[in-house]
UniProtKB/Swiss-Prot annotation:
The chain crosses the membrane at residues 209-229. Lymphocytes and monocytes. It comes from the Eukaryota. Residues 17-208 are extracellular. Residues 24-105, 107-189 form the Ig-like C2-type domain. It comes from Macaca fascicularis (Crab-eating macaque). Keywords: Cell membrane, Disulfide bond, Glycoprotein, IgG-binding protein, Immunity, Immunoglobulin domain, Membrane, Receptor, Repeat, Secreted, Signal, Transmembrane, Transmembrane helix. One of its GO terms (biological process) is antibody-dependent cellular cytotoxicity. This is Low affinity immunoglobulin gamma Fc region receptor III-A. InterPro entries: Ig-like_dom, Ig-like_dom_sf, Ig-like_fold, Ig_Fc_receptor, Ig_sub. Forms a heterooligomeric complex with ITAM-containing signaling subunits, either a homodimer of CD247, a homodimer of FCER1G or a heterodimer of CD247 and FCER1G. Interacts (via transmembrane domain) with signaling subunits; this interaction is a prerequisite for receptor complex expression on the cell surface and intracellular signal transduction. Binds the Fc region of antigen-complexed IgG with a preference for IgG1 and IgG3 isotypes. Interacts with CD2; this interaction is involved in NK cell activation and cytotoxicity. SUPFAM superfamilies: Immunoglobulin.
Length: 254
Protein backbone atom coordinates (compact mmCIF):
# COMPACT_ATOMS: atom_id res chain seq x y z
CA UNK A 1 0.00 0.00 0.00
CA UNK A 2 2.83 2.42 0.84
CA UNK A 3 4.32 2.31 -2.63
CA UNK A 4 1.02 3.61 -4.05
CA UNK A 5 1.18 6.86 -2.09
CA UNK A 6 2.48 9.98 -3.76
CA UNK A 7 6.01 10.81 -2.54
CA UNK A 8 5.05 14.15 -0.98
CA UNK A 9 2.04 12.68 0.77
CA UNK A 10 4.20 9.85 2.14
CA UNK A 11 6.55 12.34 3.78
CA UNK A 12 3.58 14.18 5.29
CA UNK A 13 2.16 10.96 6.67
CA UNK A 14 5.43 9.92 8.27
CA UNK A 15 5.89 13.34 9.88
CA UNK A 16 2.33 13.32 11.19
CA UNK A 17 2.54 9.75 12.46
CA UNK A 18 -0.33 8.63 10.21
CA UNK A 19 -0.70 5.29 8.47
CA UNK A 20 -1.86 4.65 4.91
CA UNK A 21 -4.87 2.67 6.12
CA UNK A 22 -6.05 5.74 8.05
CA UNK A 23 -6.61 7.64 4.80
CA UNK A 24 -9.99 7.74 3.02
CA UNK A 25 -10.35 5.90 -0.26
CA UNK A 26 -10.58 7.87 -3.50
CA UNK A 27 -13.67 7.41 -5.72
CA UNK A 28 -13.93 7.38 -9.53
CA UNK A 29 -17.04 8.76 -11.24
CA UNK A 30 -18.02 8.42 -14.89
CA UNK A 31 -19.48 11.38 -16.75
CA UNK A 32 -21.88 10.70 -18.32
CA UNK A 33 -22.83 7.85 -16.01
CA UNK A 34 -22.80 5.07 -18.64
CA UNK A 35 -20.00 2.53 -18.31
CA UNK A 36 -20.92 0.95 -21.69
CA UNK A 37 -20.16 3.29 -24.58
CA UNK A 38 -19.71 3.16 -28.35
CA UNK A 39 -16.57 3.95 -30.30
CA UNK A 40 -16.04 7.70 -30.82
CA UNK A 41 -17.99 8.54 -27.64
CA UNK A 42 -16.56 11.18 -25.33
CA UNK A 43 -15.93 9.94 -21.79
CA UNK A 44 -14.80 11.79 -18.67
CA UNK A 45 -13.56 10.05 -15.53
CA UNK A 46 -13.41 12.16 -12.38
CA UNK A 47 -11.42 11.42 -9.24
CA UNK A 48 -12.80 12.46 -5.87
CA UNK A 49 -10.29 12.50 -3.04
CA UNK A 50 -8.45 14.69 -0.54
CA UNK A 51 -5.38 16.72 -1.51
CA UNK A 52 -2.57 18.17 0.56
CA UNK A 53 -1.71 21.88 0.12
CA UNK A 54 1.70 20.90 -1.25
CA UNK A 55 0.46 18.33 -3.79
CA UNK A 56 -2.78 18.51 -5.77
CA UNK A 57 -1.82 15.96 -8.41
CA UNK A 58 -3.80 12.79 -9.19
CA UNK A 59 -2.52 9.38 -10.20
CA UNK A 60 -4.60 7.47 -12.76
CA UNK A 61 -4.34 3.74 -13.51
CA UNK A 62 -5.75 1.87 -16.50
CA UNK A 63 -5.67 -1.91 -16.04
CA UNK A 64 -3.06 -1.35 -13.28
CA UNK A 65 -0.77 0.67 -15.58
CA UNK A 66 0.01 4.26 -14.61
CA UNK A 67 -1.43 6.92 -16.97
CA UNK A 68 0.48 10.11 -17.67
CA UNK A 69 -2.48 12.36 -16.75
CA UNK A 70 -2.16 14.02 -13.32
CA UNK A 71 -5.35 16.13 -13.27
CA UNK A 72 -8.46 15.27 -11.25
CA UNK A 73 -10.37 14.54 -14.49
CA UNK A 74 -9.25 12.13 -17.18
CA UNK A 75 -10.70 12.83 -20.64
CA UNK A 76 -11.20 10.37 -23.49
CA UNK A 77 -12.15 12.51 -26.50
CA UNK A 78 -13.04 9.62 -28.84
CA UNK A 79 -13.26 6.22 -27.17
CA UNK A 80 -11.65 3.19 -28.78
CA UNK A 81 -11.90 -0.49 -27.93
CA UNK A 82 -8.47 -0.45 -26.27
CA UNK A 83 -9.80 2.15 -23.80
CA UNK A 84 -11.90 -0.62 -22.27
CA UNK A 85 -10.89 -1.92 -18.86
CA UNK A 86 -10.59 -0.93 -15.21
CA UNK A 87 -9.77 2.60 -14.08
CA UNK A 88 -8.54 3.66 -10.64
CA UNK A 89 -7.27 6.89 -9.17
CA UNK A 90 -5.43 8.15 -6.10
CA UNK A 91 -4.79 11.58 -4.63
CA UNK A 92 -2.11 12.76 -2.23
CA UNK A 93 -4.31 12.21 0.84
CA UNK A 94 -6.36 9.22 -0.26
CA UNK A 95 -5.71 5.56 -0.93
CA UNK A 96 -6.26 3.83 -4.25
CA UNK A 97 -9.90 3.83 -5.36
CA UNK A 98 -11.99 0.80 -6.19
CA UNK A 99 -11.96 -0.04 -9.91
CA UNK A 100 -14.54 1.39 -12.31
CA UNK A 101 -15.20 -0.62 -15.45
CA UNK A 102 -15.43 0.99 -18.91
CA UNK A 103 -16.64 -1.03 -21.92
CA UNK A 104 -16.21 0.34 -25.45
CA UNK A 105 -18.38 -1.43 -28.04
CA UNK A 106 -18.58 -1.39 -31.82
CA UNK A 107 -22.03 -1.08 -33.43
CA UNK A 108 -24.88 1.18 -34.44
CA UNK A 109 -26.88 0.89 -31.21
CA UNK A 110 -26.09 0.23 -27.56
CA UNK A 111 -28.51 -0.20 -24.68
CA UNK A 112 -27.16 1.72 -21.68
CA UNK A 113 -28.01 1.70 -17.97
CA UNK A 114 -26.11 2.80 -14.84
CA UNK A 115 -26.02 -0.87 -13.74
CA UNK A 116 -27.84 -4.13 -14.41
CA UNK A 117 -28.88 -5.24 -10.90
CA UNK A 118 -31.59 -3.31 -9.05
CA UNK A 119 -33.63 -3.75 -5.90
CA UNK A 120 -37.42 -3.80 -5.88
CA UNK A 121 -38.97 -0.30 -6.10
CA UNK A 122 -35.75 1.27 -7.37
CA UNK A 123 -36.05 3.31 -10.56
CA UNK A 124 -34.48 2.02 -13.79
CA UNK A 125 -33.13 4.35 -16.48
CA UNK A 126 -32.48 2.84 -19.92
CA UNK A 127 -31.02 4.65 -22.93
CA UNK A 128 -30.93 3.49 -26.55
CA UNK A 129 -27.69 5.13 -27.69
CA UNK A 130 -26.77 5.47 -31.38
CA UNK A 131 -23.27 5.68 -32.84
CA UNK A 132 -22.05 9.31 -32.92
CA UNK A 133 -25.58 10.26 -31.73
CA UNK A 134 -26.95 9.63 -35.22
CA UNK A 135 -30.65 10.51 -35.56
CA UNK A 136 -32.75 7.51 -34.51
CA UNK A 137 -36.53 7.14 -34.82
CA UNK A 138 -39.29 4.55 -34.34
CA UNK A 139 -37.49 3.21 -31.29
CA UNK A 140 -38.74 0.16 -29.39
CA UNK A 141 -37.46 -1.15 -26.05
CA UNK A 142 -38.02 -4.90 -25.76
CA UNK A 143 -38.08 -7.22 -22.75
CA UNK A 144 -37.74 -10.98 -23.31
CA UNK A 145 -38.39 -10.43 -27.02
CA UNK A 146 -41.66 -8.51 -26.51
CA UNK A 147 -42.12 -4.78 -27.09
CA UNK A 148 -42.16 -2.89 -23.80
CA UNK A 149 -42.10 0.77 -24.88
CA UNK A 150 -42.29 2.56 -28.23
CA UNK A 151 -41.15 6.09 -29.11
CA UNK A 152 -41.59 7.76 -32.48
CA UNK A 153 -38.47 9.82 -31.71
CA UNK A 154 -35.62 8.38 -29.67
CA UNK A 155 -36.19 8.83 -25.92
CA UNK A 156 -34.93 7.28 -22.72
CA UNK A 157 -37.10 4.63 -21.06
CA UNK A 158 -37.83 4.90 -17.33
CA UNK A 159 -39.30 2.30 -14.99
CA UNK A 160 -40.26 4.31 -11.85
CA UNK A 161 -40.53 1.35 -9.42
CA UNK A 162 -38.98 -1.94 -10.39
CA UNK A 163 -40.75 -5.22 -9.63
CA UNK A 164 -39.60 -8.82 -9.99
CA UNK A 165 -41.47 -8.96 -13.31
CA UNK A 166 -39.02 -6.39 -14.71
CA UNK A 167 -36.18 -8.93 -14.62
CA UNK A 168 -35.19 -10.31 -18.00
CA UNK A 169 -33.29 -9.72 -21.22
CA UNK A 170 -33.54 -6.28 -22.84
CA UNK A 171 -32.52 -4.70 -26.12
CA UNK A 172 -33.63 -1.77 -28.25
CA UNK A 173 -34.11 -1.27 -31.97
CA UNK A 174 -35.00 1.54 -34.32
CA UNK A 175 -34.43 3.15 -37.70
CA UNK A 176 -31.40 5.15 -38.79
CA UNK A 177 -32.65 6.58 -42.05
CA UNK A 178 -34.27 3.51 -43.61
CA UNK A 179 -31.84 1.09 -41.96
CA UNK A 180 -33.29 -1.16 -39.24
CA UNK A 181 -30.72 -1.50 -36.42
CA UNK A 182 -30.70 -3.29 -33.04
CA UNK A 183 -28.56 -3.29 -29.92
CA UNK A 184 -27.03 -6.29 -28.20
CA UNK A 185 -29.12 -8.00 -25.53
CA UNK A 186 -28.36 -7.36 -21.84
CA UNK A 187 -29.82 -8.94 -18.71
CA UNK A 188 -31.47 -6.90 -15.97
CA UNK A 189 -31.96 -8.51 -12.55
CA UNK A 190 -34.36 -7.30 -9.85
CA UNK A 191 -33.58 -8.54 -6.33
CA UNK A 192 -36.12 -8.89 -3.53
CA UNK A 193 -35.81 -7.61 0.02
CA UNK A 194 -34.93 -10.56 2.30
CA UNK A 195 -37.52 -9.67 4.98
CA UNK A 196 -40.33 -9.46 2.43
CA UNK A 197 -39.11 -12.63 0.75
CA UNK A 198 -39.18 -14.66 4.00
CA UNK A 199 -42.75 -13.57 4.80
CA UNK A 200 -43.91 -14.31 1.26
CA UNK A 201 -42.43 -17.81 1.41
CA UNK A 202 -44.60 -18.66 4.45
CA UNK A 203 -47.77 -17.00 3.16
CA UNK A 204 -48.87 -16.97 -0.50
CA UNK A 205 -49.98 -13.52 -1.76
CA UNK A 206 -53.71 -14.36 -1.39
CA UNK A 207 -53.29 -15.20 2.31
CA UNK A 208 -51.10 -12.31 3.45
CA UNK A 209 -54.03 -9.89 3.95
CA UNK A 210 -56.03 -12.53 5.85
CA UNK A 211 -53.01 -13.23 8.07
CA UNK A 212 -52.71 -9.54 8.96
CA UNK A 213 -56.44 -9.32 9.82
CA UNK A 214 -56.21 -12.39 12.06
CA UNK A 215 -53.23 -10.88 13.90
CA UNK A 216 -55.17 -7.63 14.49
CA UNK A 217 -58.19 -9.55 15.84
CA UNK A 218 -56.01 -11.65 18.14
CA UNK A 219 -54.38 -8.51 19.49
CA UNK A 220 -57.81 -6.93 20.16
CA UNK A 221 -59.08 -10.04 21.97
CA UNK A 222 -55.89 -10.31 24.02
CA UNK A 223 -56.14 -6.64 25.04
CA UNK A 224 -59.80 -7.08 26.06
CA UNK A 225 -58.99 -10.11 28.20
CA UNK A 226 -56.15 -8.24 29.88
CA UNK A 227 -58.35 -5.34 31.03
CA UNK A 228 -61.18 -7.70 32.00
CA UNK A 229 -58.87 -9.75 34.22
CA UNK A 230 -57.33 -6.62 35.70
CA UNK A 231 -60.77 -5.35 36.68
CA UNK A 232 -61.88 -8.62 38.29
CA UNK A 233 -58.74 -9.19 40.40
CA UNK A 234 -59.46 -6.46 43.05
CA UNK A 235 -63.03 -7.76 43.47
CA UNK A 236 -61.81 -11.31 44.01
CA UNK A 237 -59.30 -10.06 46.61
CA UNK A 238 -62.03 -8.28 48.59
CA UNK A 239 -64.22 -11.40 48.57
CA UNK A 240 -61.29 -13.41 49.91
CA UNK A 241 -60.69 -10.97 52.78
CA UNK A 242 -64.39 -10.74 53.77
CA UNK A 243 -64.97 -14.48 53.80
CA UNK A 244 -64.99 -16.07 57.30
CA UNK A 245 -63.65 -19.54 57.70
CA UNK A 246 -64.87 -21.89 60.43
CA UNK A 247 -62.19 -24.27 61.54
CA UNK A 248 -63.14 -27.60 63.10
CA UNK A 249 -61.27 -28.86 66.13
CA UNK A 250 -59.18 -31.94 66.12
CA UNK A 251 -60.84 -35.00 67.71
CA UNK A 252 -58.59 -34.77 70.74
CA UNK A 253 -59.68 -31.18 71.47
CA UNK A 254 -63.30 -32.17 72.01
Amino acid sequence: MWQLLLPTALLLLVSAGMRAEDLPKAVVFLEPQWYRVLEKDRVTLKCQGAYSPEDNSTRWFHNESLISSQTSSYFIAAARVNNSGEYRCQTSLSTLSDPVQLEVHIGWLLLQAPRWVFKEEESIHLRCHSWKNTLLHKVTYLQNGKGRKYFHQNSDFYIPKATLKDSGSYFCRGLIGSKNVSSETVNITITQDLAVSSISSFFPPGYQVSFCLVMVLLFAVDTGLYFSMKKSIPSSTRDWEDHKFKWSKDPQDK
